[in-house]
Structures are given as structure tokens and as C-alpha cells.
């Protein structure tokens, strides 16, 4: 009983390490990230790709209200997995820091600089009583001096740089797929195809344009932009990943035949 009470104390105390060096609330925040739908980042030779799963809980929900890819600055995009409200707070913080850098130094903020400012902010919430960690992971991609950069933040406030990564649900399976198929020499279009194929690999190899979000930051223009449904559909159709709804139609026909 005493040991159980001690563990509960470490559970509730965000600023207290357990005897084996763990911060339980940070670990629980990481579990919250795993419950979110997947987000993917891919660094290519001429840009960065961000792709997210935008599955909704009800057909009555407007898909446009599900935002998982955000513009932090003209040359930086951010994808999230985990608690949407926590992500929104960090996105707002990132945008403010980008504006401050522009006003203070007269130049756009660097991707690595912005990532470190975000992770410093996140890390503060692992040391202060009366608060909790952010239950969200971010993928931050952008261009600096013609070079694509791709970073991850986690609830502990630790930054990592990647060539390709996934966060959220099925991250292990998606990362295995990326490791097997990633090529550093691929271009931006090939990076989009890889990200979509990785998402499809954990979704029965089928995706709909409305159920995903895709954004790119191009080295040539150094500009963030999101793909339209038509552009996403073209990529999915070319890769034979487009969900045509035939399975649902077949199931409906089977049900009708049974009722008859």
C-alpha cells in the first residue's frame, strides 16, 4: 500500500522525479499524442512535405473544421498530433515568435531557431507546479537559405531533426514504411507520394482527398502552401491509392440483397 501511495504522489507531481528518473505526467502526455491521428513529415531535395490524417468522428462534422496543418510563417509549416487545443496554443506562440523575430531583426525566423523557442516554451511546463505538459507533438518544416529543414517537438520539450518522421497513431508502422522507402534524392512530388503511401499503408491502402491534409514548402519559392482537394486526388489516383467508395457500394448491395 505504501509503495502504491508513493507512485500516486509521483503521478500527480509534475515537478517530481520518480526513483527511477521518470516524470509520469510527461509520459502520459506522450500517450495523448499516440491517441491522435497520424501526421507525417518528409524532407526532400527541393522542399518539405507535411501530410496528416483528418479522419472525423461523425459524418455530421465539417471536415474543414479539422485543422492539423498550420502556417507559422511564409516559409514554415507545422503539423500536429495529439490534443488539438494544445496544438492551437503552440501554433499561436510560434506565429508570435516569428513576428517578433521579423520586427526585431528584419528577417524571417530560422526553422531551427523557431523550433528551439517552441521547445523551450514546452519544457517550462514540465518544471512548473499548477500546470500540465502539452499533450501534443509538432512536426515543423521549412526552408532556410535554400535548405529544407524538418524538426519534431515532443511533450518533454526536446527537439529532434529528421529526414522523415511520423507522430500520432500508428507512428511505428508508418516510420517502418518511411525507413524502407525514403530516398534523400527524391523531389517534392515524390515526397508527397511517399507521405500519402505511408498514410495509406495503415488505412487499407486507400485514402480520400477530403480525409487528408497535405502541405509543402518549396525551396525555389520558400513559400508554404496547402494542396487542394483536386491536387490531392491527382496524387492519390496516380499512386492507385484513391478511395473510390466501391467497397461501401458493394456492402450496400449485399445488404439490399439480404433484405430482399
UniProtKB/Swiss-Prot annotation:
Activity regulation annotation text: The formation of the proteasomal ATPase PAN-20S proteasome complex, via the docking of the C-termini of PAN into the intersubunit pockets in the alpha-rings, triggers opening of the gate for substrate entry. Interconversion between the open-gate and close-gate conformations leads to a dynamic regulation of the 20S proteasome proteolysis activity.
Intracellular or extracellular location(s): Cytoplasm
UniProt main location, coarse: cytoplasm
InterPro entries, alphabetized: Ntn_hydrolases_N, Proteasome_alpha, Proteasome_alpha-type, Proteasome_asu_arc, Proteasome_asu_N, Proteasome_sua/b
Covalent S-S links between cysteines: none
One GO MF term: threonine-type endopeptidase activity
Assigned keywords, A-Z: Cytoplasm, Proteasome
Record-linked HAMAP family: Proteasome_A_A (MF_00289_A)
Assembly mode: The 20S proteasome core is composed of 14 alpha and 14 beta subunits that assemble into four stacked heptameric rings, resulting in a barrel-shaped structure. The two inner rings, each composed of seven catalytic beta subunits, are sandwiched by two outer rings, each composed of seven alpha subunits. The catalytic chamber with the active sites is on the inside of the barrel. Has a gated structure, the ends of the cylinder being occluded by the N-termini of the alpha-subunits. Is capped at one or both ends by the proteasome regulatory ATPase, PAN.
Membership in a protein family: Belongs to the peptidase T1A family.
Name used for this protein in its record: Proteasome subunit alpha 1
Native organism: Haloarcula marismortui (strain ATCC 43049 / DSM 3752 / JCM 8966 / VKM B-1809)
Gene: psmA1
Amino acid at each position: 500500500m505504501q509503495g502504491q501511495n508513493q507512485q500516486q504522489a509521483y503521478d500527480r507531481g509534475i515537478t517530481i522525479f520518480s526513483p527511477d528518473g521518470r516524470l509520469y505526467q510527461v509520459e502520459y502526455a506522450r500517450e495523448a499524442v499516440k491517441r491522435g491521428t497520424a501526421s507525417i513529415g518528409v524532407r526532400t531535395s527541393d522542399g518539405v512535405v507535411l501530410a496528416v490524417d483528418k479522419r472525423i468522428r461523425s459524418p455530421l462534422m465539417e471536415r474543414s473544421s479539422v485543422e492539423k496543418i498550420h502556417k507559422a510563417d511564409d516559409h514554415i509549416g507545422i503539423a500536429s498530433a495529439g490534443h488539438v487545443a494544445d496544438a492551437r496554443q503552440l501554433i499561436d506562440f510560434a506565429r508570435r515568435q516569428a513576428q517578433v523575430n521579423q520586427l526585431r531583426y528584419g528577417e524571417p525566423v530560422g526553422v531551427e531557431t523557431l523550433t528551439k523557442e517552441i521547445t523551450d516554451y514546452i519544457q517550462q511546463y514540465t518544471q512548473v507546479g499548477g500546470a500540465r505538459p502539452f499533450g501534443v507533438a509538432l512536426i515543423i518544416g521549412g526552408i532556410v537559405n535554400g535548405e529544407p529543414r524538418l524538426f519534431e517537438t515532443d511533450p518533454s520539450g526536446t527537439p529532434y531533426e529528421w529526414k522523415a518522421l511520423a507522430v500520432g497513431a500508428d507512428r511505428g508502422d508508418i516510420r517502418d514504411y518511411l525507413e524502407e522507402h525514403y530516398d534523400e534524392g527524391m523531389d517534392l512530388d515524390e515526397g508527397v507520394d511517399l507521405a500519402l503511401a505511408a498514410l495509406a499503408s495503415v488505412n487499407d491502402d486507400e485514402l480520400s482527398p477530403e480525409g487528408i491534409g497535405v502541405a509543402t514548402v518549396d525551396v525555389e519559392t520558400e513559400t508554404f502552401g496547402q494542396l487542394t482537394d483536386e491536387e490531392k486526388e491527382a496524387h492519390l489516383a496516380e499512386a492507385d491509392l484513391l478511395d473510390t467508395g466501391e467497397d461501401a457500394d458493394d456492402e450496400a448491395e449485399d445488404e439490399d440483397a439480404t433484405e430482399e
